[in-house]
UniProtKB/Swiss-Prot annotation:
Pathway: Carbohydrate biosynthesis; gluconeogenesis; Carbohydrate degradation; glycolysis; D-glyceraldehyde 3-phosphate from glycerone phosphate: step 1/1. This is Triosephosphate isomerase. SUPFAM superfamilies: Triosephosphate isomerase (TIM). GO terms for molecular function: triose-phosphate isomerase activity. The active site is at H95, E167. It comes from Serratia proteamaculans (strain 568). It catalyses: D-glyceraldehyde 3-phosphate = dihydroxyacetone phosphate.
Length: 255
């Protein structure tokens, strides 16, 4: 049985003071919540500090990116082994901001997926369409292409224990969000697409929604059968708002 996962992507935000303050508040807000996995992905600079601040809690440590190389002359990069060594578990790859600003391709992201699996880390594979692609009716085509980059090189088995985050690009940081019915339709398509190769893996893979999820719209989104939590951006920087989202995910899946 799938359990939801709510993960906070802090993006390029944080300070030593903020890390301690936010994690302390999260620990307090979420101390009695169960039935929902929780993870946060601070900037890499603060991973070690966050690890110590999270010690003894049920909140997992994540990261926002990884390089395909394990070591060597690759200035500014961070390897899977380094992330594992510092205690990170959930690693975001393929985020639309990486695809857009750093020109990351489907093939490069699939390679990162493989590197993470080999290292025993959990890939959080972000997929999703632009506003233009959505308007052109290409949502399923785009999502299938991005998933196929992994399926065709590593097989459906690679998604065992992995996480997919559907993040319609037109709904990221815009205040827009897919309706629960729209999001559910795409999540079902993603699951069905993987099921063509392996129904058992498809049934178990966690598929998060990641388009402007906040404390106001989360509960309704989580009532949908194929939405397994959320990848949260801005709202993850506010302990009270993030806690509402986590509690909504836990409550929805218990219902």
């Amino acid at each position: 049985m799938r359990h939801p996962l709510v993960m906070g992507n802090w993006k390029l935000n944080g300070s030593t003071h903020m890390v301690n303050e936010l994690i302390a508040a999260l620990r307090n807000e979420l101390s009695s919540v169960d039935g929902c996995g929780v993870a946060i992905a601070p900037p890499v600079m603060y991973l070690d500090q966050a690890k110590h601040a999270l010690a003894g809690s049920r909140i997992a440590l994540g990261a926002q990116n990884v390089d395909v190389n394990l070591s060597g002359a690759f200035t500014g990069e961070v390897s899977a082994d380094m992330l594992k060594d510092i205690g990170a578990q959930y690693i975001i790859i393929g985020h639309s901001e990486r695809r857009t600003y750093h020109k990351e391709t489907d093939a490069a992201i699939a390679e990162k997926f493989a590197v993470l699996k080999t290292a025993g880390l959990i890939p959080v594979l972000c997929i999703g369409e632009t506003d233009a692609e959505n308007e052109a009716g290409k949502t399923e085509e785009v999502c299938a292409r991005q998933i196929d980059a992994v399926l065709k090189t590593q097989g459906a088995e690679a998604f065992k224990g992995a996480v997919i985050a559907y993040e319609p690009i037109w709904a990221i940081g815009t205040g827009k969000s897919a309706t629960p019915a729209q999001a559910q339709a795409v999540h079902k398509f993603i699951r069905d697409h993987i099921a063509k190769q392996d129904a058992a893996v498809a049934a178990e893979v966690i598929i998060q929604y990641g388009g402007s999820v906040n404390d106001k719209n989360a509960a309704e989104l989580f009532t949908q059968p194929d939405i397994d939590g959320a990848l949260v951006g801005g709202a993850s920087l506010k302990a009270d708002a993030f806690a509402v989202i986590v509690k909504a995910a836990a409550a929805a899946k218990k219902a």
